[in-house]
Regions:
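Polytopic alpha-helical membrane proteins, predominantly small-molecule transporters/carriers
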Residues: 1-106
């Protein structure tokens, strides 16, 4: 049962890559960032589908979205100087705990 979770976590990481990549595509007018973003999106979806063959779809999708949301929020703070507040930090921590809670209860 290790491999489906590995697929899922890599898919979540790639979701962060394509979401952040959208900032660099300039509406998909820049070909290199657009190619990177599209490739990350495609591989992320394929790995999510592969993980969902063995994991409950509700759990797989929730974990995938959670990793993407958490990672994208963190990258927004680190790369794009997006604001961080105490409440945002608390909810990001709760999201992190929720991802692992879903993994351990699946």
């Amino acid at each position: 049962m290790f491999l489906p979770w590995l697929y899922l976590f890599v898919a979540g990481f790639l979701e962060v890559c394509w979401a952040v990549g959208l900032k660099y595509t300039d509406g998909f007018s820049k070909w290199m960032p657009s190619l990177f973003t599209g490739t990350a999106l495609l591989i992320s979806m394929l790995l999510l589908a592969k993980a969902a063959q063995s994991l409950p779809i509700g759990t797989a999708y929730a974990v995938w979205v959670g990793i993407g949301a958490l990672g994208t929020a963190i990258m927004g703070i680190l790369l794009f100087q997006e604001p961080i507040s105490l409440f945002r930090l608390i909810f990001l921590i709760l999201l992190f705990l929720s991802i692992f809670g879903l993994k351990y209860t699946a």
